[in-house]
Structures are given as C-alpha cells and as structure tokens.
Amino acid sequence: MAREEKRPMIVRIRKFERKDIPKKVEWINNPQNNKSLHYDIPLEVEKTQKWFDSNIGRTDRYDAVIEADGVPCGTIGLLEIDKKNSKAEYYIAMGETSLKGKGISTQASKILLDYAFGELKLNRIYLYTETENIPAQRLFEKLGFIKEG
C-alpha cells in the first residue's frame, strides 16, 4: 500500500482584483470571521465595488489576496503607507475557515513583510487588534511584532 505524504501548501499573495470582490464579501459576512473585523455587516457587493474603484491608483495602500495552492483564502495588506516616515499599518483576515490554523497566515505575512521592508523600504509596520483576538496576537508575536500600550 502506497503512503501519501502531506506536502506543504504553496502560499502566495497577489494584488486584490475586481474578481475577488464576491469572495471578500462572502468572507466578511461569515459570522466565524467578522467578530474582530471592523465592517458594517452585512457587507454588500455594490458597496465593495465602490470601495475597490475608489482605491484604484492609490499608492498609500496595498490590498492583496492570500492564495494557498492557487485557491483564494483571505486578504492581507498595508494601509496608510507613509514613505516619508517609512511606516505602514498591516492587516490580515483569513476568509476560508477550513484553512485557519494551517500556517497560511504566517507564510503570507512573511511575504508581505518582506515586500514592505524590502521593496517599499519601510522601517516600521504596525497593527491594531482586539484584546480578545488571541490567535491573531500569537501570529503577530511569532512574526516579531512588539506589543505596545
């Protein structure tokens, strides 16, 4: 009998595109996901399309989709990119609940942080999280973020 070995998932991030809007709306409207997110629920496709259109060409933010083995599974990005002061705000939200806890967020975050510190030449990345969002806090500590306040 052949034994099948588990291989690690291939994780990548890519720029958020118009085609990703329905998935983002689905993920955010899922009660398992939106407890720690700051959105007016239910999120609507039309409102999200307007958000997307209003952000085209902006250089002060970078919105991306996380893919694991080619399947979209969450969003990640940088907000308030301030090149003058070399800083930005980081965010991440895993949408596919069945893929949580598999290390995808860690891998995607490392890719994004490499981009932020390498290509964008930033020297400070910060974030905000809810006090009760312990899984996210563990991820952020693992990535080297330091708790303030």
Where are these regions (language model features)?
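Short loop/turn motifs at secondary-structure junctions and domain boundaries
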Residues: 54-60
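A short, well-structured alpha-helix characteristic of acyl/acetyltransferase catalytic modules
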Residues: 1-50
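Acyl-donor (CoA/ACP) binding surface of acyl/acetyltransferases
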Residues: 2-23, 63, 68-149
